[in-house]
Amino acid sequence: MPAMRGLLAPQNTFLDTIATRFDGTHSNFVLGNAQVAGLFPVVYCSDGFCDLTGFSRAEVMQRGCACSFLYGPDTSELVRQQIRKALDEHKEFKAELILYRKSGLPFWCLLDVIPIKNEKGEVALFLVSHKDISETKNRGGPDNWKERGGGRRRYGRAGSKGFNANRRRSRAVLYHLSGHLQKQPKGKHKLNKGVFGEKPNLPEYKVAAIRKSPFILLHCGALRATWDGFILLATLYVAVTVPYSVCVSTAREPSAARGPPSVCDLAVEVLFILDIVLNFRTTFVSKSGQVVFAPKSICLHYVTTWFLLDVIAALPFDLLHAFKVNVYVGAHLLKTVRLLRLLRLLPRLDRYSQYSAVVLTLLMAVFALLAHWVACVWFYIGQQEIESSESELPEIGWLQELARRLETPYYLVSRSPDGGNSSGQSENCSSSSSSSGSGGGRGSEANGTGLELLGGPSLRSAYITSLYFALSSLTSVGFGNVSANTDTEKIFSICTMLIGALMHAVVFGNVTAIIQRMYARRFLYHSRTRDLRDYIRIHRIPKPLKQRMLEYFQATWAVNNGIDTTELLQSLPDELRADIAMHLHKEVLQLPLFEAASRGCLRALSLALRPAFCTPGEYLIHQGDALQALYFVCSGSMEVLKGGTVLAILGKGDLIGCELPQREQVVKANADVKGLTYCVLQCLQLAGLHESLALYPEFAPRFSRGLRGELSYNLGAGGVSAEVDTSSLSGDNTLMSTLEEKETDGEQGHTVSPAPADEPSSPLLSPGCTSSSSAAKLLSPRRTAPRPRLGGRGRPSRAGVLKPEAGPSAHPRSLDGLQLPPMPWNVPPDLSPRVVDGIEDGCSSDQPKFSFRVGQSGPECSSSPSPGTESGLLTVPLGPSEARNTDTLDKLRQAVMELSEQVLQMREGLQSLRQAVQLILVPQGEGQCPRGSGEEPCPATASGLLQPLRVDTGASSYCLQPPAGSVLSGTWPHPRPGQPPPLMAPWPWGPPASQSSPWPRATALWTSTSDSEPPGSGDLCSEPSTPASPPPSEEGARTGTPAPVSQAEATSTGEPPPGPGGRALPWDPHSLEMVLIGCHGPGTVQWTQEEGTGV
């Protein structure tokens, strides 16, 4: 896996800081929540406090941090009040008092209350420290404190005169909190500052930012990455030049003739020296994954790892030579040690190995670098073969063959005593040397004799030929034009071919199976990282959430190295898996909770344990979540929150969860559990726990009792629990309204006889029907009652036993509760008397409307329906049971009966309304009729037969007028002597409008007069089939009795009445309110009336 960046997320290290600063006798403390006024519950309890008092952590948690459960008879009442006052006012307090252990033994305690603030400056926690000072108090004798006056007078020392709490503050506790136990230089200034200066800084309960010196470099920072880039280039330069200078320059140039070092060599040495300095100030990642910022730790870590190698590689040979410092002739050979710096590049380059292009580029660079090294060594071997000859040159070396082909052979020249060169040459050498050959300037002697080696190919040709041989040997078996002749050359060629075979497979195999096996784990890590980044990019995850995802993935990978433990151990036998699980989870299984468990039970429980990981700021459990496991904190710290209030702080060794629930019970968490630092947990699944306890039932009761005492915080206390009942999920879909249920409860006193189960049910009311048509057909009084089914057993219905007054008066809320849909007045109600066949007209759905059960009628059966529900339209539930069908039938009958009664009430109301309209219109006609004079009454005031009336719209109000034809003909009736005046029949009335008649074959005669018409100039309003009458005389208009107009003539056509000039007057269907036919006088035309409808 690539080198990790380290765990750099901000963490709340308050608990770790307190735990590290408190040790020994000063570790007896509790932390109380200062945000819960009045109670200040304990959210954390140290192990030392439990050992001191004898109480377990579970017994102390959520109690008051004043530790009133430790009070006893000898505890000073004054100190109690002062402790309570200090907690309420969020102030520091210190006192000495007597407390009692759980066993009842008293002990002197030095109590110190210290408020802890958060990042907002608010007091978030109380640190209550307890120190046992019984030995100090009892030095004069075990009962010395009693002889001096008892406990209450002496133990309230904090309230005595002259006591200063600030001056008597516990130096040990505060020094531990502020880190003053470290050695500090002694001086007067620092002593005065520590005594009279400001108080030491206490740790704050907040998310701590990364603190580091400005002179400390982050190992994954941008500055360090840039510096590593320069070091990479310098290392590659060293890897190329050092082998060349060692193999080529040493062989062909004397050491005294070497020139000054180049600028690049000096710059590289300076970079290596500065790199050593920076490494002492660069952070590193510890084995636990934490980033170390302490300078001392950084220096110690660097000295024990790479320091020695970097010092040897950074020896400034070239720099000393530049300053004319005499260096040993072979000292520059130590430069080869710098090649070891390539090992340092591997961890740094590993982060780029997930990119295939970078991998191929690096492999090609490594292959070329290796070929360069092989070429240098091959040239050095050939040169040494020539110089090793004592008296004559060898003729089988590869350089000798190259010299003959290039016609630049080697030759030996004897050196004369005066320093000149002799002309004696060996017979196989040419007489002249090439001035262009680099060997012409050499001054080396052969074998210490007076012979000097000259001639040979140039250095450029020799190196290119060596590189050609190296590449041909590494990539294949070579072509033979440059071959190994001597034994030394052949041995080196063999090694080169072996290396070449490996490099050929790695580079030209394009990362095949060998590479996949070598980097399988790395590929898996990069593959998952790439998938995670692609997921983040596709779904546009915000940056904070993206960082949390990457941090969690890297942290979990560091814990398990990408190994799926479940899949890995699945192939192993159960016996071996149990032993491995017990070894992995031995820290959890060593808890007192599992002391009574047998080894078999422990093995079963270990298989149910799973590792878990939580990063800072992550919620392990949310309030209201179903608790499915118990969690044991192995490392790190967490906090329990509820509504932003800290209820508990959990550290290493704490157990969180709930008491053992039943197998079908679901327990909901009553608080949130949030990680403060990187936490490693062990998770015990409740499902696996139940299975294990089912196998070992003798351990279940003891485990359940012990779990209550071991839980650091019970997340199930007061939580919501529910029994999982799968039977409630399967049931018949019954449509039953609430009002029906209430009515059923209220009618339990009535006798209900269920209908036979084999009777078919009629359809329900279709929801797709229009409100008008559905309601009209439902309200039809001619709808036939359910007919008895032949051959069926009749059962008395509920309607037969109802009281006679069980009508509308018996149900005062029936009329208001009847939610009838609105019906427009211009649409006549559908009063069809036909029997409903299950599918109504005008519906958008073919679903059935009503469900009737037809039974055999008996003497007690009633055809009138029973009162129904108050929910408006009927909702008849369907059910498989016979009793439910019977109740549905009875309710339907009651609803139909109630609707019939309401229709009768509406009929009576309409009649009353008709009479009221007559009383209103008749007086208006007497005084405002435009046709009558001031002395004579309006003709409309006289009662007569049912005749078409005319509405005058020219006046301020409407009045009814008789038709002109009847007045002219003298047919308007007058009262006869001795007889009451005939009743005037009401007529459909309303203001004129612009629409046609809503009903066919129906005619009403309307006329309209205005103020512009002269009196008496009104046109006759007669049917089109009636001939026009002659003009009437004035006397005849007042006294004449017109002939009655038959109803057949009035209704023989459906055309609207003609207006002035023979034009038809339009109907007004929107203003037409009602159509009612009154009583008939003697001699009048008898109007037909539909039975039961009032029309």
UniProtKB/Swiss-Prot annotation:
Glycans are attached at N421, N428, N447. GO terms for molecular function: inward rectifier potassium channel activity. The keyword Ribosomal protein does not apply. It is found in: Cell membrane. Residues 419-436, 857-872 have a biased composition (Low complexity). Residues 1-228, 281-302, 353-361, 512-1095 are cytoplasmic. It comes from the Eukaryota. Gene3D superfamilies: 1.10.1200.260, 1.10.287.70, Jelly Rolls, PAS domain. Residues 93-145 form the PAC domain. N-glycosylated. N-glycosylation mediates traffick to the cell membrane but is not necessary for voltage-gated potassium channel activity. The chain crosses the membrane at residues 229-249, 260-280, 303-323, 332-352, 362-382, 491-511. Coiled coil: none annotated. Residues 465-485 dip into the membrane without crossing it. Residues 137-150 have a biased composition (Basic and acidic residues). Residues 784-796 have a biased composition (Basic residues). Residues 18-90 form the PAS domain. It is a multi-pass membrane protein. InterPro entries: cNMP-bd_dom, cNMP-bd_dom_sf, Ion_trans_dom, K_chnl_volt-dep_EAG/ELK/ERG, K_chnl_volt-dep_ELK, KCNH_animal-type, PAC, PAS. A motif (Selectivity filter) lies at residues 476-481. GO terms for biological process: potassium ion transport. A nucleoside 3',5'-cyclic phosphate binds at residues 593-708. Belongs to the potassium channel family. H (Eag) (TC 1.A.1.20) subfamily. Kv12.2/KCNH3 sub-subfamily. Pore-forming (alpha) subunit of a voltage-gated inwardly rectifying potassium channel. Charactherized by a fast rate of activation during depolarization followed by a rapid inactivation at much more depolarized value causing inward rectification due to a C-type inactivation mechanism. Exhibits a rapid recovery from inactivation. The potassium channel is probably composed of a homo- or heterotetrameric complex of pore-forming alpha subunits that can associate with modulating beta subunits. Interacts with KCNE1 and KCNE3; these interactions regulate KCNH3 trafficking to the plasma membrane and its subsequent voltage-gated potassium channel activity. This is Voltage-gated inwardly rectifying potassium channel KCNH3.
